[in-house]
Amino acid sequence: MTSRTKSSKNLGTIALAGMVVSSIIGGGIFSLPQNMAATAGAGAVILSWILTGFGMFFIANTFRILSTIRPDLKEGIYMYSREGFGPYIGFTIGWGYWLCQIFGNVGYAVITMDALNYFFPPYFQGGNTLPAILGGSILIWVFNFIVLKGIRQASIINVIGTIFKIIPLIIFIILTAFFFKLAVFKTDFWGHAVTKAQPSLGSVSSQLKGTMLVTLWAFIGIEGAVVMSGRAKNPLSVGQATVLGFLGCLTIYILFSLLPFGSLFQHQLANIPNPSTAGVLDILVGKWGEVLMNVGLIIAVLSSWLSWTIIVAEIPFSAAKNGTFPEIFTIENKEKSPSVSLYITSSVMQLAMLLVYFSSNAWNTMLSITGVMVLPAYLASAAFLFKLSKSKTYPKKGSIKAPLAMITGILGVVYSLWLIYAGGLKYLFMALVLLALGIPFYIDAGKKKKNAKTFFAKKEIVGMTFIGLLALTAIFLFSTGRIKI
């Protein structure tokens, strides 16, 4: 192994875990108290986190097991799909995941600028004013050049950013714990009381449905270490970092959701404007708490944005190394950063940023679509684990036995399907249209390969035809108004 190859494999467990935490915890956590209290009492909130934690554990464990038994698959999410189900499925998962994170990063730009409006009103209001577009565009290229300086250097900055992100979260937890009163927490625990100030929240099942729409998306980013597995010092670090990041984030989410119920009543929390953590601390400790949370929001979003800039450039780079994306994406600079992938990705982000200026409503729709587009990657990974567990090639030795892998894969598939269903049919059909846009790029990449027959085998053609027909069906349903956008 050359020194240049070694230099690219320099991410340890802490750096990878930092990537996971920073990828998962973004600006949304600062609105979590209000988001949860808007539809549920404390009892239903507890149940929703138990159910979500149970389901996401199997997704996290899927990545842990796969990184342990197949450490040779160093391109993570994309390669699991390709290895298990062929080049076209692998490409489609990689393409959809790439688009998802590109638009997700532009979402971070919008959130950052909107958060700045707290300090500089009204210049950045909504995140789509001209100053906001200029500011967001500048940050897109700042992060581009940070990552160009090297993945390791960017990861160190990300770890530092994650630490500074967690500090205001810890302060919020400490302060809400200090003001916590059990009597307040137990008041209308199941959300059934009816008063003028506090209407009934309905049955526990209806409350669960409302909170699950929040918690279902809370762990998007859990695959952060897997995507970067090709740059890990030790393949075992990938699984360790994924589990550590998952448990850490679950703990933070539970505390953030429940402690405010002991400081303020449910109807008070439900009516606090977002970011609601700022409103909670403004009530409990005064203006300085509100300022702290708004600063924390900006740091959190910037830290997550840096993480996803690293990850989103790694996706086409990894796919191109295996011949599925165009070869140009494999070019690295002297710092071993995927330079061409970074520039192309940042350029697409820049175009998307300009679109935000003209249509904020369309942008909100796009964010919902991209939330759905990440889920096929989870589904394919869990299905691949299930497939491996049944094969004769599954490792006979080792701590992870085939039955455990099979159970994890099955439950991971079930939970992934539930997430896709919960996302809504409308956004699923929109996502299919975006996935179909990748077909010409797949065909172009396949034609240039010596093993072109593999790219255009019968099942690959069937897959392309199936996705294409679904996309055409979606376009028909949207154009005729049978499904309203």
Curated annotation (Swiss-Prot):
Membrane topology: Multi-pass membrane protein
InterPro entries in the record: AA/rel_permease1, Amino_acid_antiprt, APC_superfamily
TM helices/strands, residue ranges: 12-34, 38-60, 89-111, 126-148, 155-177, 211-230, 243-265, 291-313, 363-385, 400-422, 427-446, 461-483
One term of GO molecular function: antiporter activity
Keywords: Amino-acid transport, Antiport, Cell inner membrane, Cell membrane, Membrane, Transmembrane, Transmembrane helix, Transport, Virulence
PROSITE patterns in alphabetical order: ABC_TRANSPORTER_1
Superkingdom of the source species: Bacteria
BP GO terms, sorted: amino acid transport
Tagged with keyword Transmembrane helix: yes
One cellular component term from this protein's GO annotations in UniProt: plasma membrane
Listed Pfam families: AA_permease_2
Compartment(s) where it occurs, according to its Swiss-Prot or TrEMBL record: Cell inner membrane
UniProt-listed Gene3D superfamilies: Amino acid/polyamine transporter I
Other comment: Inhibited by L-canavanine and D-arginine. Resistant to cadaverine, L-lysine and L-ornithine.
Role summary: Catalyzes the exchange of L-arginine for agmatine. The arginine uptake by the bacterium in the macrophage may be a virulence factor against the host innate immune response.
Family the entry assigns: Belongs to the amino acid-polyamine-organocation (APC) superfamily. Basic amino acid/polyamine antiporter (APA) (TC 2.A.3.2) family.
Protein name as catalogued: Arginine/agmatine antiporter
Annotated source species: Chlamydia pneumoniae (Chlamydophila pneumoniae)
Lineage, opening ranks: Bacteria, Pseudomonadati, Chlamydiota, Chlamydiia, Chlamydiales
